Protein backbone atom coordinates (compact mmCIF):
# COMPACT_ATOMS: atom_id res chain seq x y z
CA UNK A 1 0.00 0.00 0.00
CA UNK A 2 1.11 3.54 -0.76
CA UNK A 3 -0.30 6.94 0.19
CA UNK A 4 -1.77 7.19 -3.32
CA UNK A 5 -4.22 4.49 -2.23
CA UNK A 6 -5.50 6.78 0.54
CA UNK A 7 -8.02 9.61 -0.08
CA UNK A 8 -6.48 13.00 -0.90
CA UNK A 9 -8.05 14.59 2.19
CA UNK A 10 -6.07 12.14 4.32
CA UNK A 11 -2.82 12.61 2.39
CA UNK A 12 -2.86 16.36 3.09
CA UNK A 13 -1.79 15.51 6.64
CA UNK A 14 2.01 15.67 6.35
CA UNK A 15 2.78 14.91 10.00
CA UNK A 16 0.74 13.38 12.80
CA UNK A 17 0.61 11.04 15.75
CA UNK A 18 -0.64 7.51 15.31
CA UNK A 19 -3.97 8.65 16.74
CA UNK A 20 -4.19 11.61 14.36
CA UNK A 21 -3.50 9.45 11.32
CA UNK A 22 -6.25 7.07 12.42
CA UNK A 23 -8.60 9.99 13.09
CA UNK A 24 -8.39 11.05 9.44
CA UNK A 25 -9.41 7.63 8.21
CA UNK A 26 -6.38 5.33 8.16
CA UNK A 27 -7.20 1.99 9.76
CA UNK A 28 -4.69 0.17 11.98
CA UNK A 29 -4.05 -2.33 9.19
CA UNK A 30 -3.50 0.44 6.64
CA UNK A 31 -1.19 2.25 9.05
CA UNK A 32 0.98 -0.86 9.50
CA UNK A 33 1.09 -1.37 5.75
CA UNK A 34 2.07 2.27 5.10
CA UNK A 35 4.87 2.21 7.65
CA UNK A 36 6.23 -1.10 6.32
CA UNK A 37 6.23 0.35 2.79
CA UNK A 38 7.99 3.51 3.95
CA UNK A 39 5.09 5.74 2.90
CA UNK A 40 4.85 6.92 6.51
CA UNK A 41 8.15 7.53 8.30
CA UNK A 42 8.70 7.74 12.05
CA UNK A 43 10.22 11.17 12.82
CA UNK A 44 9.79 11.11 16.58
CA UNK A 45 8.39 8.72 19.12
CA UNK A 46 4.74 8.29 18.21
CA UNK A 47 4.93 10.81 15.35
CA UNK A 48 4.95 9.89 11.65
CA UNK A 49 5.41 11.98 8.50
CA UNK A 50 4.73 11.23 4.87
CA UNK A 51 7.72 10.10 2.86
CA UNK A 52 7.32 13.08 0.52
CA UNK A 53 7.55 15.47 3.51
CA UNK A 54 10.75 13.80 4.69
CA UNK A 55 12.28 13.76 1.20
CA UNK A 56 11.41 17.44 0.64
CA UNK A 57 13.03 18.30 3.96
CA UNK A 58 16.25 16.66 2.86
CA UNK A 59 16.41 18.77 -0.30
CA UNK A 60 15.37 22.21 0.97
CA UNK A 61 16.35 23.97 4.24
CA UNK A 62 12.97 25.70 4.45
CA UNK A 63 11.13 22.41 3.99
CA UNK A 64 13.39 20.89 6.64
CA UNK A 65 12.48 23.62 9.11
CA UNK A 66 8.82 23.28 8.18
CA UNK A 67 8.96 19.58 9.03
CA UNK A 68 10.63 20.32 12.37
CA UNK A 69 7.96 22.92 13.11
CA UNK A 70 5.20 20.48 12.20
CA UNK A 71 6.63 17.87 14.57
CA UNK A 72 6.93 20.49 17.33
CA UNK A 73 3.28 21.48 16.80
CA UNK A 74 2.25 17.88 17.31
CA UNK A 75 4.04 17.89 20.67
CA UNK A 76 2.74 21.27 21.85
CA UNK A 77 -0.72 21.20 20.28
CA UNK A 78 -2.21 22.05 16.90
CA UNK A 79 -3.31 25.46 18.18
CA UNK A 80 0.36 26.52 18.20
CA UNK A 81 1.87 28.06 15.06
CA UNK A 82 5.43 28.54 13.85
CA UNK A 83 6.56 32.06 14.76
CA UNK A 84 9.54 34.35 15.40
CA UNK A 85 12.78 32.90 13.96
CA UNK A 86 11.01 29.80 12.60
CA UNK A 87 8.52 31.95 10.72
CA UNK A 88 11.37 34.13 9.42
CA UNK A 89 13.06 31.03 7.98
CA UNK A 90 9.85 29.91 6.28
CA UNK A 91 9.10 33.38 4.87
CA UNK A 92 12.69 33.98 3.74
CA UNK A 93 13.15 37.00 6.00
CA UNK A 94 16.77 37.83 6.83
CA UNK A 95 18.01 37.56 10.40
CA UNK A 96 21.15 39.06 11.91
CA UNK A 97 21.92 35.84 13.80
CA UNK A 98 21.44 32.44 12.21
CA UNK A 99 18.84 30.41 14.15
CA UNK A 100 20.29 27.63 16.29
CA UNK A 101 20.34 24.28 14.52
CA UNK A 102 17.35 22.10 15.34
CA UNK A 103 15.50 24.77 17.35
CA UNK A 104 11.88 25.67 16.59
CA UNK A 105 9.94 28.77 17.70
CA UNK A 106 6.19 28.47 18.27
CA UNK A 107 3.42 30.72 19.61
CA UNK A 108 0.19 29.48 21.18
CA UNK A 109 -2.89 31.47 22.25
CA UNK A 110 -3.13 32.17 26.00
CA UNK A 111 -5.26 29.73 27.96
CA UNK A 112 -4.89 26.85 25.51
CA UNK A 113 -3.90 23.49 26.93
CA UNK A 114 -0.31 22.76 26.05
CA UNK A 115 1.32 19.43 25.38
CA UNK A 116 4.79 18.62 26.60
CA UNK A 117 7.38 20.61 24.60
CA UNK A 118 10.56 18.66 23.92
CA UNK A 119 14.06 20.09 23.99
CA UNK A 120 14.62 22.60 21.20
CA UNK A 121 11.20 24.28 21.30
CA UNK A 122 10.94 27.96 22.22
CA UNK A 123 7.29 28.45 23.12
CA UNK A 124 5.62 31.88 23.36
CA UNK A 125 2.11 32.74 24.49
CA UNK A 126 0.30 35.54 22.64
CA UNK A 127 -2.96 36.28 20.89
CA UNK A 128 -3.15 34.88 17.35
CA UNK A 129 -5.87 36.63 15.34
CA UNK A 130 -6.71 34.59 12.27
CA UNK A 131 -5.51 37.42 10.01
CA UNK A 132 -2.05 37.09 11.60
CA UNK A 133 -1.74 33.42 10.56
CA UNK A 134 -1.13 31.77 7.20
CA UNK A 135 0.13 28.42 5.89
CA UNK A 136 3.54 27.74 4.33
CA UNK A 137 4.95 24.36 3.35
CA UNK A 138 1.91 22.74 4.95
CA UNK A 139 2.54 24.38 8.35
CA UNK A 140 0.51 27.03 10.15
CA UNK A 141 2.77 30.05 10.60
CA UNK A 142 2.49 33.72 11.51
CA UNK A 143 2.22 36.06 8.53
CA UNK A 144 5.36 37.87 7.42
CA UNK A 145 4.15 41.12 8.99
CA UNK A 146 3.28 39.53 12.34
CA UNK A 147 6.59 37.68 12.22
CA UNK A 148 8.52 40.92 11.80
CA UNK A 149 6.65 42.56 14.68
CA UNK A 150 7.29 39.54 16.93
CA UNK A 151 10.99 39.58 16.08
CA UNK A 152 11.27 43.32 16.63
CA UNK A 153 9.48 42.97 19.99
CA UNK A 154 11.60 40.10 21.28
CA UNK A 155 15.07 40.79 19.83
CA UNK A 156 17.41 43.80 19.92
CA UNK A 157 16.56 46.99 18.08
CA UNK A 158 19.21 46.27 15.43
CA UNK A 159 17.89 42.75 14.86
CA UNK A 160 14.41 44.19 14.51
CA UNK A 161 15.57 46.68 11.88
CA UNK A 162 17.24 43.86 9.94
CA UNK A 163 13.94 41.95 9.84
CA UNK A 164 11.86 45.03 8.93
CA UNK A 165 14.23 46.05 6.12
CA UNK A 166 14.35 42.52 4.72
CA UNK A 167 10.57 42.04 4.67
CA UNK A 168 10.04 45.43 3.03
CA UNK A 169 12.79 44.78 0.48
CA UNK A 170 11.41 41.46 -0.76
CA UNK A 171 7.82 42.69 -0.73
CA UNK A 172 6.65 40.43 2.09
CA UNK A 173 4.80 43.28 3.78
CA UNK A 174 3.67 46.87 3.34
CA UNK A 175 3.90 49.91 5.61
CA UNK A 176 0.10 49.84 5.93
CA UNK A 177 0.04 46.18 6.97
CA UNK A 178 2.86 46.76 9.43
CA UNK A 179 1.01 49.66 11.05
CA UNK A 180 -2.11 47.49 11.38
CA UNK A 181 -0.29 44.67 13.20
CA UNK A 182 1.52 47.16 15.43
CA UNK A 183 -1.85 48.55 16.51
CA UNK A 184 -2.99 45.02 17.41
CA UNK A 185 0.13 44.51 19.55
CA UNK A 186 0.33 48.05 20.97
CA UNK A 187 0.26 46.98 24.63
CA UNK A 188 2.42 43.89 24.30
CA UNK A 189 5.95 43.61 25.72
CA UNK A 190 8.50 45.15 23.36
CA UNK A 191 5.88 46.98 21.29
CA UNK A 192 7.64 50.35 21.60
CA UNK A 193 10.91 48.86 20.33
CA UNK A 194 9.06 47.20 17.45
CA UNK A 195 7.44 50.52 16.55
CA UNK A 196 10.84 52.24 16.50
CA UNK A 197 12.25 49.56 14.21
CA UNK A 198 9.21 49.79 11.94
CA UNK A 199 9.47 53.58 11.68
CA UNK A 200 13.17 53.29 10.83
CA UNK A 201 12.71 50.49 8.29
CA UNK A 202 13.59 50.91 4.63
CA UNK A 203 13.11 48.71 1.58
CA UNK A 204 16.27 50.27 0.10
CA UNK A 205 18.69 48.56 2.49
CA UNK A 206 19.89 45.70 0.29
CA UNK A 207 21.65 43.49 2.84
CA UNK A 208 21.86 42.65 6.52
CA UNK A 209 25.16 44.56 6.73
CA UNK A 210 23.56 47.68 5.27
CA UNK A 211 20.68 47.46 7.75
CA UNK A 212 23.11 47.16 10.66
CA UNK A 213 25.16 50.07 9.34
CA UNK A 214 22.06 52.26 9.20
CA UNK A 215 21.51 51.64 12.92
CA UNK A 216 25.16 52.33 13.79
CA UNK A 217 25.15 55.55 11.74
CA UNK A 218 21.93 56.79 13.37
CA UNK A 219 23.09 55.97 16.89
CA UNK A 220 26.34 57.85 16.22
CA UNK A 221 24.34 60.92 15.21
CA UNK A 222 25.29 60.95 11.53
CA UNK A 223 22.85 62.63 9.13
CA UNK A 224 20.50 60.13 7.51
CA UNK A 225 22.07 58.97 4.23
CA UNK A 226 20.40 58.40 0.89
CA UNK A 227 20.28 54.65 0.18
CA UNK A 228 21.09 53.17 -3.23
CA UNK A 229 21.83 56.59 -4.68
CA UNK A 230 22.55 56.72 -8.41
CA UNK A 231 25.79 58.64 -9.03
CA UNK A 232 26.56 60.24 -12.39
CA UNK A 233 29.25 62.41 -13.94
CA UNK A 234 28.77 66.12 -14.65
CA UNK A 235 27.76 65.01 -18.15
CA UNK A 236 24.98 62.84 -16.65
CA UNK A 237 26.81 59.60 -17.45
CA UNK A 238 25.85 56.91 -14.93
CA UNK A 239 28.74 55.70 -12.77
CA UNK A 240 27.28 53.51 -10.06
CA UNK A 241 24.55 52.92 -7.54
CA UNK A 242 26.06 53.21 -4.06
CA UNK A 243 25.02 51.86 -0.66
CA UNK A 244 25.04 55.16 1.27
CA UNK A 245 25.41 58.73 0.09
CA UNK A 246 25.44 62.11 1.83
CA UNK A 247 25.01 64.47 -1.14
CA UNK A 248 25.55 67.62 0.94
CA UNK A 249 29.06 66.41 1.80
CA UNK A 250 29.64 64.46 -1.44
CA UNK A 251 30.50 61.43 0.67
CA UNK A 252 29.78 57.79 -0.18
CA UNK A 253 30.01 54.80 2.16
CA UNK A 254 30.12 51.24 0.85
CA UNK A 255 29.33 48.14 2.93
CA UNK A 256 31.75 45.44 1.84
CA UNK A 257 30.18 42.05 2.51
CA UNK A 258 32.23 38.88 2.70
CA UNK A 259 31.41 37.87 -0.89
CA UNK A 260 31.65 41.30 -2.46
CA UNK A 261 35.19 40.97 -3.81
CA UNK A 262 35.68 37.21 -3.76
CA UNK A 263 37.06 37.29 -7.31
CA UNK A 264 40.11 39.27 -8.51
CA UNK A 265 38.11 40.70 -11.41
CA UNK A 266 35.42 42.02 -9.09
CA UNK A 267 38.08 43.60 -6.88
CA UNK A 268 39.64 45.32 -9.91
CA UNK A 269 36.22 46.54 -11.04
CA UNK A 270 35.64 48.02 -7.59
CA UNK A 271 38.95 49.92 -7.71
CA UNK A 272 38.05 51.40 -11.11
CA UNK A 273 34.56 52.25 -9.84
CA UNK A 274 36.04 54.12 -6.86
CA UNK A 275 38.36 56.05 -9.17
CA UNK A 276 35.40 57.17 -11.29
CA UNK A 277 33.43 58.19 -8.19
CA UNK A 278 36.38 60.23 -6.90
CA UNK A 279 36.88 61.80 -10.32
CA UNK A 280 33.24 62.91 -10.06
CA UNK A 281 34.10 64.70 -6.80
CA UNK A 282 32.96 62.13 -4.25
CA UNK A 283 34.86 60.86 -1.22
CA UNK A 284 34.46 57.10 -0.77
CA UNK A 285 34.64 55.22 2.54
CA UNK A 286 34.57 51.43 2.67
CA UNK A 287 33.83 49.32 5.75
CA UNK A 288 33.46 45.60 6.50
CA UNK A 289 31.49 43.39 8.89
CA UNK A 290 34.49 43.16 11.18
CA UNK A 291 34.94 46.92 11.32
CA UNK A 292 31.27 47.74 11.85
CA UNK A 293 30.94 45.35 14.79
CA UNK A 294 34.53 45.39 16.08
CA UNK A 295 35.54 49.04 15.77
CA UNK A 296 32.43 51.01 14.79
CA UNK A 297 33.96 54.21 16.16
CA UNK A 298 36.67 54.00 13.48
CA UNK A 299 34.08 53.65 10.73
CA UNK A 300 32.22 56.69 12.07
CA UNK A 301 35.47 58.65 12.38
CA UNK A 302 36.37 57.90 8.74
CA UNK A 303 32.96 59.08 7.56
CA UNK A 304 33.13 62.23 9.68
CA UNK A 305 36.65 62.81 8.36
CA UNK A 306 35.33 62.54 4.82
CA UNK A 307 32.60 65.06 5.67
CA UNK A 308 35.29 67.55 6.71
CA UNK A 309 37.72 66.82 3.87
CA UNK A 310 37.93 68.90 0.66
CA UNK A 311 35.48 67.83 -2.02
CA UNK A 312 38.13 66.53 -4.44
CA UNK A 313 41.39 64.71 -3.80
Regions from the language model: what does each represent?
Residues 1-190, 308-313:
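Short gly/ser-rich loop at a beta-strand->alpha-helix junction or flexible surface loop bordering the NTP-binding
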Residues 1-4, 8-12, 20, 25-29, ...:
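Surface segments flanking catalytic/ligand-binding clefts of nucleic-acid enzymes
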Amino acid sequence: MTLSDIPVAVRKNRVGTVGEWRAVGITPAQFRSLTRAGALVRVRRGVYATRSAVESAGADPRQDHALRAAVARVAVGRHAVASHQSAAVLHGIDLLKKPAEGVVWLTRPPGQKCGRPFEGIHLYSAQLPEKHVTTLYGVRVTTATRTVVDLARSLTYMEGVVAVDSALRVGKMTDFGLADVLRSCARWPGADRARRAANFGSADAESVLESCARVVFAEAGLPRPVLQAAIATAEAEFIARVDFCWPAYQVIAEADGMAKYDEPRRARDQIMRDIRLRDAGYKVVHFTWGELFGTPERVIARIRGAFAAPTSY
